[in-house]
């Protein structure tokens, strides 16, 4: 197996575990968790925000560890924190324990992305980096698909599913240890100065986009299944199917690099925002099952994963020769936005209802069409 394939598949697997299972499986498990451990939508938003707070902290740590010790250490820590957090979730009996487990699991995704971006920058030729990065980023969808399938097989037993996810995280460590080799001291460099990275042309604009994108995306990724069941009135079987479609559609992010060659990265970026905006408005207007909910779910899944791929590629490019720092900053602001979005959507949901909250969050995605990560109008 050549290094492009080995690194791509290892990264895909690690992202699947840390994002799809340790982070985004919360959304699909939320309705069942609320039946076992009752709490309000406002509390649900606060618990979901814990994952993003953890992400915000670990993404800085990942950049430091990557530059000081190489990509291997933070990648290994990502798998370990995912496993520990998922086990705590499986054993939880109160909202506080749920928040603790989700926080520890949330550390994993922040550790994973910058380390993998740095590994790609060091080991993959420049002309192949966008394709490998977007392949790795699509692991989010792979993890979501697998998490839905596991939950279906286990008839919604979310505690047992969390244990299965934790075991998968530990298995992923073997691939990480084999593919990401320990680096020699002379290959490492001192951590970048954040002021230097922030001063890079176009970086501030990218961070604004990442923040607002995070706010807008929280509606679906923190409350999607809850909305499908309580707002739209679907049963758990259809909800799981729609979540599976949403995750599966995100696999389209694998083709981000190829699409960018045809319509440009700005075109890819605009499409991703339109996907997210249209899907949220459609969900706001839906009551009861309709066939068009399947493309709605697909649009949201594809839109978010493609958009995060744009942020990853652009952040890494702007921050050269310290791509991990650029990815860390972009994904940090994405996570900060998701913290704000999770809490804000929970409050709006409780105050004005799901429809009004969804329309408002859709407008955030639409507004970003007027700001390009490349500075074009």
Predicted regions span which residues?
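Extracytoplasmic gate region of multi-pass secondary transporters
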Residues: 26-27, 203-244, 251
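Cytoplasmic helix-loop-helix junction between adjacent transmembrane helices
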Residues: 101-138
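Helix-loop-helix hairpin linking two adjacent transmembrane segments in secondary transporters
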Residues: 126-180
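Symmetry-related core transmembrane helices of the 12-TM Major Facilitator Superfamily/SLC fold
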Residues: 161-177, 356-373
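C-terminal transmembrane helical hairpin of 12-TM major facilitator-type secondary transporters
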Residues: 266-311
């Amino acid at each position: 197996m050549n290094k492009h394939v080995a690194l791509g598949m290892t990264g895909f697997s690690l992202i699947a575990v840390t994002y799809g299972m340790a982070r985004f499986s919360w959304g699909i498990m939320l309705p069942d968790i609320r039946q076992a451990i009752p709490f309000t939508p406002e509390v649900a938003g606060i618990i979901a925000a814990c994952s993003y707070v953890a992400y915000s902290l670990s993404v800085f740590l990942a950049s430091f560890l990557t530059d000081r010790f190489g990509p291997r250490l933070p990648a290994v820590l990502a798998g370990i924190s995912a496993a520990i957090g998922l086990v705590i979730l499986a054993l939880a009996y109160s909202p506080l324990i749920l928040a603790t487990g989700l926080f520890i699991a949330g550390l994993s995704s922040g550790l994973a992305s910058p380390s993998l971006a740095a590994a790609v920058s060091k080991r993959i030729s420049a002309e192949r980096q966008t394709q490998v990065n977007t392949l790795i980023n699509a692991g989010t969808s792979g993890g979501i698909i697998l998490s839905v399938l596991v939950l279906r097989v286990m008839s919604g037993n979310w505690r047992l599913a969390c244990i299965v996810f934790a075991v998968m995280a530990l298995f992923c460590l073997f691939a990480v240890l084999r593919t990401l080799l320990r680096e020699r001291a002379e290959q490492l460099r001192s951590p970048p100065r954040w002021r230097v990275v922030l001063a890079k042309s176009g970086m501030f604009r990218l961070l604004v986009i990442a923040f607002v994108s995070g706010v807008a995306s929280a509606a679906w990724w923190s409350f999607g299944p809850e909305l499908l069941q309580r707002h739209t009135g679907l049963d758990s079987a259809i909800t799981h199917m729609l979540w599976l479609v949403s995750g599966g559609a995100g696999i389209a992010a694998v083709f981000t690099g190829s699409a960018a060659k045809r319509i440009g990265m700005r075109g890819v970026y605009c499409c991703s925002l339109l996907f997210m905006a249209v899907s949220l408005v459609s969900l706001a207007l839906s009551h009861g099952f309709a066939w068009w909910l399947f493309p709605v779910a697909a649009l949201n899944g594809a839109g978010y994963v493609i958009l995060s791929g744009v942020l990853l590629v652009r952040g890494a490019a702007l921050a050269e020769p310290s791509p991990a720092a650029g990815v860390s900053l972009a994904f940090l602001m994405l996570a900060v936005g998701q913290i704000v979005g999770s809490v804000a959507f929970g409050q709006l949901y409780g105050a004005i209802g799901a429809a009004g909250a969804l329309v408002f969050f859709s407008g955030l995605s639409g507004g970003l069409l007027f700001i390009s990560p490349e500075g074009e109008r």
